[in-house]
Every structure is written in structure tokens, then in C-alpha cells.
Amino acid sequence: ISAYTMSTSNITSYVPNGMEVGSTPDGRSAKSPLNEGCSPTQGSDTCGPTAVLLSVAKLPNEKVAAGQLLNMRFSPSSMKSPESLAKFKALLRTSVRLGIYHNQFNVLDSKVLRDAMAHPENYGDLMVRVAGYCAQFVSLMPQAQEAILARSENGVSV
């Protein structure tokens, strides 16, 4: 028996599809990458990771059989202390309590990403979570690299 299920994941197409789409009401400029799944448009999550979770929880997540892809990026410096790691664990527990199960995280510094873009020969082992899959950062097309860099770099001061 075949069945169609709803999904918001645009795993490999959010960058090329964005090149064909005009501006959107969320502030995304024409020809820029679309958001990945239910993730905020790059740079628009200005109120922190807890606010993102509370927004995503308002979606009918239980009706999306294929899951709701949520990408978030955190600063490595915000994960160094036992207290900050405890806050990150609390954020994960909150996500589960809210019914959000398909979370993906990059713990990457913007400075490192910019340096990898400028000097790819030095970063062959830099792996990133793209949208449903991992890839070597330097192997991605420049627009995909920019989209990952444009994701807000969060702390865990929830």
C-alpha cells in the first residue's frame, strides 16, 4: 500500500530552490536560500534558541510523518562550562517535551567557517550538518556555505 506523507524537509534543495524564489514575508531576500524544514530563515531567529523551540512547537508536528527538520547552530565557546552543558541538556529536554524530535546541531564558530571559505585547503576535515545530512564544509557550493554561516550562532543562556 502506498501512502503520501507530509514533510517540510527540503534536504538538498533549499539553496538551489531559493535561487528561483522571490522575496518572502519573513524577510528573506529574493534568490537567497530558503529555510531548511521548520528552521527559521537564516539570521531571523533573533530571540534565541528557546524562542525558536516555542515557535516550532506551535506547528502541527504530529501530522508531519517524515519529521520537521530543525537546524540550530551554537558557538563552541558557549558550550565549555558544566553549567552551559547543563543548559544545553535542558534545551534538548524541552524540545522533546514540546514534541520536537528532529533537531540537528552544528557547534561551529563563525570565524572558523569564514577562514575555511577563504582557505579551504586547511579545512578538509571540517564536517557540518547541512539539512538532513553531513558534508565536508569545503565541498559545498559557496551558496550553501554562506547559508550555514548565516544561521544564527546561538549561546545556551536559556
Give a label for each model feature.
Residues 1-158:
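Acidic, glycine-enriched catalytic cores built around paired aspartates
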